[in-house]
Amino acid sequence: KNSLLINETGIDSNSTFRRKTSKSDEPFKIIWIGKFDFRKQLPIAIKSITAMNQRNVELHICGTGNDDAVNEMKRMAEICGIASKCHWHGNVSHDKILKMMASSDLMFFTSIMEATSTVVLEAITVGLPILCFNTCGFGPIVKDFAGITVELSNPYKSVQDFAHELSLLYQNRAVLNDISTRMLEKRQELTWEAKAKKLVRHYEEILKK
């Protein structure tokens, strides 16, 4: 039987936030958003930044967990030698998140269990390229036009794969700008209005049979 996939979240077509142009002589600003829990896999992000071994990198971490989880993540950053590259923002308001996205070069989304995360659609709204796993509801969207994906494997290989992609993007910011342009051109396909029209169209086609 044929199946129809329509992701369960949409983008805000009225948003005025737009991502900045990436420049090679500026810090490589990466934003990570989520809870400090197993699903979100912040340790993979921290270890990937460590493995890419580039000096002019900033990892902006938006989100939090219980005291033990926060202390553990900060301790991991120190042990990995990237504490100075990590900026811990805690819980951030929606408007501030959009502003931070607009001033970032890349969203690093390390979640391994998710539907179509709202922050992925918000990044697309802003035109912020995404680096993530090719899994769950968000993977196919990112792989299609919104960024770069790596295959879900094991923690060690994931860190190596992400670090490889991060290094390539760090060295060639024009790739990020090209992805951003493509995102803004195609994002209308993911608005709530477009999804509603698509759903109605398919219902009408079914009723005609």
Name what the model sees in each region:
Residues 72-92:
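Nucleotide-activated donor-binding/catalytic signature segment of Leloir-type glycosyltransferases, i.e.
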Residues 33, 58-73, 90:
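Glycosyltransferase donor-sugar binding loop
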Residues 22-40, 46-49, 60:
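Conserved donor-binding/catalytic core segment of Leloir-type glycosyltransferases
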Residues 129-132:
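Short hydrophobic beta-strand element within catalytic cores of glycosyltransferases
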Residues 1-18, 25:
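Donor nucleotide-sugar binding/catalytic pocket of nucleotide-sugar-dependent glycosyltransferases
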